[in-house]
Amino acid sequence: MGKYIRKSKIDGAGAGAGGGGGGGGGGESSIALMDVVSPSSSSSLGVLTRAKSLALQQQQQRCLLQKPSSPSSLPPTSASPNPPSKQKMKKKQQQMNDCGSYLQLRSRRLQKKPPIVVIRSTKRRKQQRRNETCGRNPNPRSNLDSIRGDGSRSDSVSESVVFGKDKDLISEINKDPTFGQNFFDLEEEHTQSFNRTTRESTPCSLIRRPEIMTTPGSSTKLNICVSESNQREDSLSRSHRRRPTTPEMDEFFSGAEEEQQKQFIEKYNFDPVNEQPLPGRFEWTKVDD
């Protein structure tokens, strides 16, 4: 447990220990004392525990703050934990600053610019293109009317005329890139006229029924009506086909009926056609109503 130390006076100053244990000094030098359980001492003093050592350290820190003394005079047990150095503090601050700057840069990267400017620019470009097309081609449908007129007049040369005007339109579009908006309407009407010219030039041998030929330039509604009428005629012709007569039906099912009757007679010794019992395994009796 340690060595026994008796209370003594050093340089006229008294040094003593009391209670749970402590150290005091007077004059120039002082010595720290530690309570040890002696056989003569009472059992109330107890043993130095962790709680007591922590209380001693706190008390010594308070004394050092009130009356600072030289580090050589302090006992080794009462030495307070070394405070963190300035370099460590600086490193921690730099790490915190680095983390903050990294987060700021990351948040800046994630930010997106609003697309309002892009939308406005596209609208302005569309308006400029429309104005340019109106200025360069004030009536684009006049060309279409001429194309349709040429296609309806000619029968054999219509396809060549249409293809020639297609080439002219393509060359105009390549020269003027802003002609794309009106080109969709031109293409739709132009395909209609092209289909009409091809209808006029189709030979009759390709058609299944030459009686139902339609005039060139007719709408698709007439073709739909004709197809529906053809379907009705086919259904009526199928319904009016020759149906089998009753003797033919009897001849068709007679073989299967005879086989079933034979099997029934052999099994139950009863004639189902004449409704008469036959000699055999079962005995049949008539039930009175």
From Swiss-Prot:
A biological process term (GO) from this entry: negative regulation of cyclin-dependent protein serine/threonine kinase activity
Q: Where in the cell is it found?
A: Nucleus, Nucleoplasm
Q: Biased composition, Polar residues: where in the chain? A: 134-144
Gly residues bias (residue ranges): 13-28
The question of whether Signal is a record keyword is answered with no
A GO molecular-function term, please? cyclin-dependent protein serine/threonine kinase inhibitor activity
Q: Which UniProt keywords apply?
A: Cell cycle, Nucleus, Protein kinase inhibitor
Q: Which domain of life is it from?
A: Eukaryota
Q: In which tissues is it expressed?
A: Expressed in leaves and flowers and at lower levels in roots.
Q: Name one GO cellular component term.
A: cytoplasm
Q: Which InterPro entries match?
A: CDI_dom, CDI_dom_sf, KRP
Described purpose of this protein according to its UniProt entry:
Binds and inhibits CYCD2-1/CDKA-1 complex kinase activity. May target specifically CDKA-1.
What is stated as this protein's family in its record? Answer: Belongs to the CDI family. ICK/KRP subfamily.
This chain belongs to which protein, by name? Cyclin-dependent kinase inhibitor 4
UniProt organism field: Arabidopsis thaliana
Q: What is the lineage of its organism?
A: Eukaryota, Viridiplantae, Streptophyta, Embryophyta, Tracheophyta
Q: What gene, per UniProt, encodes this protein?
A: KRP4
